[in-house]
From Swiss-Prot:
The chain crosses the membrane at residues 27-47, 67-87. Its EC number is 1.10.3.-. This is Anthrone oxygenase AacuG. The gene is AacuG. It is found in: Membrane. It comes from Aspergillus aculeatus (strain ATCC 16872 / CBS 172.66 / WB 5094).
Length: 108
């Protein structure tokens, strides 16, 4: 027979270590960093390295292509994580509008 203090601990359900609030903020931060790096780093480098219009157009189109592949899916994932965090929080309390407001501010 197990010790009386161990039995309640064994009956407790183990909580998941996944925190949707942290995941939403992290993916939003990564997305914001990626967009800022494109604006503040990649575009000036493109303009400094070449002035030949066809080559500049080719580099810009490749940069747009890579951003088009990655960034929209990251934005959708971030939005879904904010919604999931709001739903999880709403199940525990009634202040889920703060997370939805955070998602709305991040998308605008």
């Amino acid at each position: 027979m197990p010790h009386p203090m161990v039995a309640p601990a064994l009956r407790r359900r183990r909580r998941s270590s996944f925190n949707p609030h942290v995941a939403a903020v992290m993916t939003g931060s990564i997305l914001a960093g990626a967009m800022l790096s494109l604006s503040f780093i990649a575009v000036p480098v493109l303009l400094d390295t070449t002035t030949h219009p066809p080559q500049l157009f080719h580099k810009w189109s490749r940069l747009y292509h890579y951003g088009h592949v990655v960034l929209p899916s990251t934005a959708i994932l971030t939005g879904l994580l904010y919604i999931y965090a709001a739903v999880c929080h709403h199940q525990r309390s009634s202040r889920s509008s703060l997370y939805l407001a955070g998602y709305g501010a991040q998308q605008s």
